[in-house]
Amino acid sequence: MSDTLISMDYRFVDILNANQLEVGDLIGLGIVGIVKIISIAPMKDGFLLVIENEFNEEEDVEILDDEKFEFFILE
Protein backbone atom coordinates (compact mmCIF):
# COMPACT_ATOMS: atom_id res chain seq x y z
CA MET A 1 0.00 0.00 0.00
CA SER A 2 1.43 3.37 -0.95
CA ASP A 3 0.93 6.56 0.98
CA THR A 4 -0.09 9.63 -0.97
CA LEU A 5 0.36 13.19 0.21
CA ILE A 6 -2.36 15.46 -1.11
CA SER A 7 -1.47 19.13 -1.29
CA MET A 8 -4.33 21.61 -1.07
CA ASP A 9 -3.82 25.26 -1.93
CA TYR A 10 -5.92 28.33 -1.25
CA ARG A 11 -7.18 30.12 -4.35
CA PHE A 12 -8.33 33.75 -4.17
CA VAL A 13 -11.85 34.05 -5.59
CA ASP A 14 -13.39 37.42 -4.76
CA ILE A 15 -13.68 40.37 -2.39
CA LEU A 16 -16.71 40.18 -0.07
CA ASN A 17 -18.43 42.88 1.97
CA ALA A 18 -19.03 42.12 5.64
CA ASN A 19 -22.75 41.50 5.00
CA GLN A 20 -21.92 38.85 2.35
CA LEU A 21 -19.96 36.59 4.71
CA GLU A 22 -21.37 33.15 5.55
CA VAL A 23 -20.55 30.40 8.01
CA GLY A 24 -17.89 28.14 6.50
CA ASP A 25 -16.29 30.87 4.35
CA LEU A 26 -12.50 31.04 4.18
CA ILE A 27 -11.40 34.67 4.40
CA GLY A 28 -8.17 36.60 4.66
CA LEU A 29 -8.00 38.37 8.01
CA GLY A 30 -5.03 40.75 8.28
CA ILE A 31 -1.93 39.34 9.96
CA VAL A 32 -3.87 36.28 11.20
CA GLY A 33 -3.98 34.89 7.66
CA ILE A 34 -6.70 32.76 6.12
CA VAL A 35 -9.36 31.67 8.62
CA LYS A 36 -12.66 29.78 8.56
CA ILE A 37 -15.83 31.46 9.82
CA ILE A 38 -17.49 29.32 12.50
CA SER A 39 -20.36 31.67 13.40
CA ILE A 40 -21.65 35.17 12.66
CA ALA A 41 -23.73 37.35 14.99
CA PRO A 42 -25.03 40.84 14.12
CA MET A 43 -24.04 43.77 16.33
CA LYS A 44 -24.94 47.47 16.34
CA ASP A 45 -22.15 48.57 13.94
CA GLY A 46 -21.14 45.29 12.35
CA PHE A 47 -20.76 41.62 13.17
CA LEU A 48 -19.12 39.35 15.71
CA LEU A 49 -17.31 36.49 13.98
CA VAL A 50 -16.07 33.34 15.62
CA ILE A 51 -13.15 32.23 13.47
CA GLU A 52 -10.90 29.18 13.38
CA ASN A 53 -7.23 29.44 12.39
CA GLU A 54 -4.97 26.81 10.84
CA PHE A 55 -4.24 25.36 14.30
CA ASN A 56 -7.98 24.82 15.00
CA GLU A 57 -7.94 27.59 17.61
CA GLU A 58 -11.14 29.63 17.84
CA GLU A 59 -11.21 33.37 18.39
CA ASP A 60 -13.87 36.13 18.50
CA VAL A 61 -13.37 39.02 16.08
CA GLU A 62 -15.51 42.16 15.76
CA ILE A 63 -15.83 43.60 12.24
CA LEU A 64 -17.52 46.73 10.93
CA ASP A 65 -20.31 46.90 8.34
CA ASP A 66 -18.08 48.62 5.77
CA GLU A 67 -15.12 46.20 5.88
CA LYS A 68 -14.14 44.05 2.91
CA PHE A 69 -12.50 40.61 2.98
CA GLU A 70 -10.62 38.42 0.54
CA PHE A 71 -12.59 35.19 -0.10
CA PHE A 72 -10.69 31.94 -0.76
CA ILE A 73 -11.49 28.34 -1.70
CA LEU A 74 -9.40 25.20 -1.26
CA GLU A 75 -8.34 23.38 -4.40
Residue ranges of model-derived segments:
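Mixed-charge, Lys/Arg-rich low-complexity intrinsically disordered regions
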Residues: 1-23
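Intrinsically disordered, low-complexity, charged/polar segments
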Residues: 2-8, 58-75
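Generic detector of N-terminal low-structure segments
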Residues: 14, 49, 71-74
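Intrinsic disorder/low-complexity segments
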Residues: 18-20, 42, 68
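Short, hydrophobic/aromatic-rich segments at coil-to-beta transitions
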Residues: 22-25, 47-48
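Basic/aromatic-rich interaction segments and small domains that mediate binding to polyanionic partners
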Residues: 34-62
